[in-house]
Amino acid sequence: MLGCLLERISGQTYEEFVQENIFKPLGMNDSGLMSFVSIIPRRASGYWPGSNGTENADRPDPRVGFSSGSLYSTTEDLLRWEEGLFGGTVLSLASLRKMTTPFKSDYACGLHVNRVNGHLMIEHDGNNIGFNSDLAYYPEERITVVVLANLNGTVTGEMTRALAAVAHGETPPIPSVHKEISLSKEVLTRYAGTYQFPHYSLKMIPEGNHLLVEFDNGGTLAVFPEADTKFFSKPWPTQFEFSKNEHGEFTILTRYQDGAKEIGAKK
């Protein structure tokens, strides 16, 4: 919607506007709107986890994402973007303040704003078929961390926090290793049901020796047990943990992803 408004007001295509008003002024010479027709030098191929190991990812029409994504860039160019955005080149300081002010939760205008290990962090991740990314800025120390990956399932958020810890002179967290165990059908069945989170709901469906997570947007995710109450995704940095309520019933579900957690309740 915003991309369509931008085109109507400016009289330019979205690609023309972004190139003329953002990429060229900031010197982002290796960034643009993705195309599988044009030859883009040094373009990375995308991969995803398959049943027999890593596979070539599908190549969706980049026009589908339009102004919500479908851009290509480099770590150097994204550093230039952060310097331009937080240096007052892209937006006025008043607009930047509005953009980075959280509303109700830690989410501001397209950015997550919270404290991680005592450091103020302004961050957002991104993903597309075959690619994952994470971009974080620590305004108090003026530290930027950019992580780009051409493999779905890469824990870019965890990598960002580890690199930020090094930049802050701290010890980076040790990545967790998940080991699958077997649970009885009876144990898996007690977790079946619909769970309501603040902004979405999901269903837990027992399937074989794992649970199938069915999101309200139609997406699904298989999660495997590593303990009686803990489950993890093999390709994605997502874990779930079931907890009992005051009556001793498993009705509380906590979702962990990229260092953040959300708590939902069984309907």
Regions found by a protein language model. Give the residues of each.
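Short, surface-exposed loop or secondary-structure junction motifs
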Residues: M1-P139
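Short, well-ordered loop/turn and helix-capping segments at boundaries between secondary-structure elements
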Residues: M28, G87, N150-T154, A165-G169, ...
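Short linear motifs in exposed loops
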Residues: D58-R59, N132, A136, L148, ...
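Short, solvent-exposed loop/helix junctions and linker helices
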Residues: L71-T75, G153, K185
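Peripheral terminal and inter-domain segments
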Residues: H119, E140, G157-K267
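Short, well-ordered beta-strand elements
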Residues: E123-H124, D134-L151, T251-R255
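Histidine- and/or cysteine-centered catalytic micro-motif in compact active-site loops
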Residues: D125, A149-N152, E207, D216
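Extracytoplasmic and endomembrane cell-envelope/extracellular-matrix remodeling and assembly machinery
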Residues: I129, V146-N150, T154-R161
